[in-house]
Swiss-Prot record:
Pfam families: AA_permease
Polar residues bias locations: 8-26, 45-55
Inducers of expression: Expression is under control of the CSY1 amino-acid sensor.
Record's protein name: Amino-acid permease GAP5
Residue spans of biased composition, Low complexity class: 27-40
Organism: Candida albicans (strain SC5314 / ATCC MYA-2876)
Keyword Glycoprotein carried by entry: yes
The gene coding this protein: GAP5
Source superkingdom: Eukaryota
Primary localization: membrane
């Protein structure tokens, strides 16, 4: 890659390597002249001094002026050129379709308004939801305390490796759509198309599902009011959060995530007291439930089933990667946020689950007696401890969690739809971003799908959502698998093209080995899911059970081969030497970047050991 100016210092000046034959001016002089004559107009400034706030509000919904369209409008009428990653223009003959897509994704009109604290809290608490607070109950019942602990520890290590790989890619290429764009870049466009659309389907279904879950959670206190009344309240709340821009989303997530973290830490402290015999009923639990009824339930099949629940509970961990295009300083904030994943897995998942196995036996009938908050092992532990009132507190935490996940589902769906539109994999209208940086059309599409939540009072919601979830039920696993593959392919491309990790602002702490481990475990989870789809736990084999479990894989295959037929491209992988590792980078002057990184390493090397340890882990 040739030396270029950094993105922040680059102006839209057509590149020419020729000296003017008539004037003898150098190309740089010509560039300055053309820049002064053809400077594209900037975004309209706020007219609060001369206009009303209402007119400013209305204007904010108008389309943002796109950098690429401006460049095309103000460049030479006879020049057939494109802007490259560093802000230069080259002949279109020199750019592949993937390079054009990569550049387009890096020039998103989304606003960089997410601060470091927003990313920190999103990373820590983004996946603390019904999977951990309720889903662990069913996993404990089917796998036993030993099975659930093994599943969450191994899955946690896999997620840690995956997030490290994602951080390396997202910091290097902070593009709209995050990791979804990188699948087409490093693996194959058909893989990117199929996995990204499955990801969209997952979160399209998740929004109404979480709204229904919120209305059902309210029924813990009151069953007289029609659930659709609560659906309306939560629907308006969640949709409003995203319509007011990414900054409000970040603030709301920061508050809700803080409450979730405080609640889980409080439960951990309470559980230690209960396990030690400090409950009002005076019962000392210790590890007796590991001996009676035992450490494992339903043998190897039971343990395998807990891996699926563990994968579901970790869904949403990758959301940090989607924020790269809207982070104020992705180079600094994203690595720090992704490092927090280790502590979240250790504290909020592993420690919580260990304490749950001390307090609730796997044969407790309430674990499988319902699918709502009453099946939460957290609530059961509090109730069995003889503590009144705290069950309502935990129910409130579950309510906060489902609202948070619902809001995040709108964010994830809308940003992924924008990236698909930028890649020409979705209708162009889906990529509409207004002057406030809001992807309005994508948000509207997501909110329209959220109207499915009004079936909450129909009595058929369980059957409807079971089939809707089956369409994209494996989406998170496919996404994590492709993140790891993309990381390995990126490192391979660096090696083949004579480059190394010295030019990366963040390098995965688990490296390529961690990505291989992530691939291995995700493949094993898919195999376990297939086995349980054919031979379900506790019932006979049947087609309905199989498709409820594995329909997502069938949908993925249809999307994949459909895209292959559409593009008539039957190449399985982009060759390593052909992978584009330059377009869309935030830092494009590699020599200056290497010097800066070396200086940072020297400064860190001179710090005390405790500081270096803190920097590594936090």
């Amino acid at each position: 890659m040739s030396k270029k100016y950094s993105e922040e210092n680059t102006s839209s000046i057509p590149l020419t390597d020729l000296t003017s034959p008539s004037t003898g001016e150098t190309s740089s002089q010509q560039q300055r002249q053309r820049a002064s004559q053809q400077q594209p107009p900037q975004q309209p400034e706020s007219n609060t001094a001369t206009g009303s706030r209402w007119s400013n509000f209305v204007d904010s919904f108008k389309p943002a002026i796109e950098n690429e369209k401006l460049a095309m409008r103000y460049r030479d009428a006879n020049a057939d050129v494109e802007e490259d990653a560093g802000g230069y223009y080259n002949s279109t003959d020199q750019l592949t379709e993937i390079q054009r897509i990569n550049i387009n994704s890096s020039k998103s009109n989304l606003k960089r308004k997410l601060k470091n604290r927003h990313l920190q809290m999103i990373a820590i608490a983004s996946s603390i939801g019904s999977g951990l607070l309720i889903g662990t109950g069913g996993a404990l019942a089917t796998g036993g305390p030993g099975g659930i602990l093994i599943a969450w520890i191994l899955s946690g290590i896999s997620i840690l490796c995956t997030i490290q790989a994602m951080a390396e890619l997202a910091v290097t290429f902070p593009v709209s759509g995050g990791f979804n764009v990188l699948f087409s870049r490093f693996i194959d466009p058909s893989v990117g198309f199929s996995v990204a659309w499955n990801y969209v389907l997952q979160y399209l279904v998740l929004l109404p599902l979480e709204l229904v879950a919120a209305s059902m959670t309210i029924q813990y206190w009151n069953t007289d009011i029609n659930p659709d009344v609560w659906v309306i309240i939560f629907y308006v709340t969640v949709t409003s959060i995203n319509f007011f821009g990414v900054r409000l989303y970040g603030e709301v997530e920061f508050i809700l995530s803080s409450l979730k973290v405080i609640a889980v830490v409080g439960f951990i402290i309470l559980s230690i007291v209960l396990a030690a015999g400090g409950a009002p009923n005076g019962v000392h639990h210790g590890t007796k439930y590991w001996h009676d009824p035992g450490a494992f339930a339903n043998g190897f099949k039971g343990v395998s089933s807990t891996f699926i629940t563990a994968a579901f509970s970790f869904a949403g961990t990758e959301l940090t990667g989607l924020t790269s295009a809207e982070a104020e300083n992705p180079r600094k904030a994203l690595p720090k946020a992704c490092k927090q994943v280790f502590w979240r897995i250790l504290l909020f998942y592993v420690v919580s689950i260990i304490l749950i196995t001390f307090l609730v036996p796997y044969d407790n009938p309430r674990l499988l007696g319902a699918s709502d908050v009453s099946a939460s092992p957290f609530v059961i532990a509090i109730q069995d401890g003889g503590i009144s009132g705290l069950a309502s507190v935990m129910n409130s935490v579950i309510l906060i969690s489902v609202i948070s996940v619902g809001s995040s589902s709108v964010y994830a769906t809308s940003r992924t739809l924008v990236s698909l539109a930028e890649q020409n994999l979705a209708p162009k209208i889906c990529g509409y971003v207004d002057r406030a940086g809001r992807p309005l059309v994508a948000i509207l599409i997501t909110n329209v799908f959220g109207l499915l939540s009004f079936i909450a009072a129909s009595g058929k919601e369980d059957e409807v959502f079971t089939w809707l979830l089956s369409i994209s039920g494996l989406s998170s696993i496919f996404t994590w698998l492709c993140i790891c593959i993309s990381h390995i392919r990126f490192r391979r491309a660096l090696h083949v093209q004579g480059r190394n990790t010295d030019e990366l602002t963040f390098v995965s702490q688990t490296g390529v080995i961690g990505s291989w481990f992530g691939i291995l475990l995700n493949v094993l989870v898919l195999v376990a899911e297939f086995w349980l789809a054919i031979f379900p736990l506790g019932e006979k084999s049947n087609a309905k059970s199989f498709f409820e479990t594995y329909l997502g894989f069938v949908i993925l295959i249809i999307f994949y081969f459909g895209h292959k037929l559409w593009r008539n491209n039957w190449i399985l992988f982009i060759r390593s030497r052909d992978i584009d590792i330059d377009s869309g980078r935030r830092e494009t002057d590699l020599e200056a970047l290497k010097r800066e990184l070396q200086e940072e390493r020297e400064v860190l090397r001179n710090k005390p050991f405790w500081y270096r340890a803190y920097h590594f882990w936090c």
